[in-house]
């Protein structure tokens, strides 16, 4: 059984618990599914069951259509193919945030690594036999791109952007902001391992997050957790 199949089964089982009431206490509504080539799990504590599947799906679709490299028609995919230079608010904010992190890390973090990740077969790309790394490195550099007046400027049109390292965290923030507008104050959001928590869980305690132990052979999510 591969990891994707395992995740699907786990998600299906977890979805059964949606809207479960914990004794005489509050209700915890659960929402699970797939987005951006990964999974998401959301828990919301409230006085009664919440039916927000369509709203959450709409938010996730909006982000997917903007930043997902797994979606060939997303705005980011089109930017990488130079079919447009217009950016939306999601991409502009992620590029600004990424640049700040790149500057703080002296360039150790860099979202322009897409030519390299593509050459080695990440995000669904076909690996290149014996890639010319030196040539590809000339297309990498966070200071070679900028957003000006809603448009992406590249020093070289062959440059490409990979937001996978930041997109899922931004998605969690986006959903959290939506909950805040609705007055929802206690929830846990996890998108592709990027987590946003607020308030307490149904037992009145801080949310507890399990992380797969990083050891060889631990391929099944949830099989060996460290808390």
Regions found by a protein language model. Give the residues of each.
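Mature catalytic core of soluble alpha/beta enzymes
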Residues: 2-8, 16-227
């Amino acid at each position: 059984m591969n990891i994707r199949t395992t995740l699907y089964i786990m998600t299906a089982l977890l979805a059964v618990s949606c809207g479960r009431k914990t004794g005489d206490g509050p209700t915890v509504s659960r929402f699970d599914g797939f987005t951006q080539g990964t999974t998401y799990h959301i828990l919301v504590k409230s006085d009664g069951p919440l039916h927000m599947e369509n709203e959450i799906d709409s938010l996730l679709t909006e982000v997917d259509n903007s930043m997902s490299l797994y979606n060939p028609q997303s705005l980011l995919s089109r930017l990488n193919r130079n079919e447009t230079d217009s950016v939306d608010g999601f991409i502009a904010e992620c590029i600004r945030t990424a640049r700040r992190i790149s500057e703080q890390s002296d360039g150790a973090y860099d979202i322009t690594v897409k030519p390299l990740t593509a050459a080695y077969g990440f995000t669904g790309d076909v690996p290149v036999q014996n890639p010319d790394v030196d040539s590809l490195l000339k297309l990498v550099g966070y200071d070679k791109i900028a957003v000006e007046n809603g448009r992406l400027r590249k020093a070289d049109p062959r440059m490409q952007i990979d937001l996978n390292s930041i997109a899922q965290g931004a998605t969690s923030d986006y959903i959290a902001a939506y909950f805040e507008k609705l007055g929802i104050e206690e929830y846990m959001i996890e998108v592709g391992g990027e987590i946003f928590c607020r308030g307490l869980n149904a037992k009145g305690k801080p949310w507890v997050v399990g992380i797969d132990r990083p050891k060889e052979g631990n391929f099944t999510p949830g099989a060996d957790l460290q808390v």
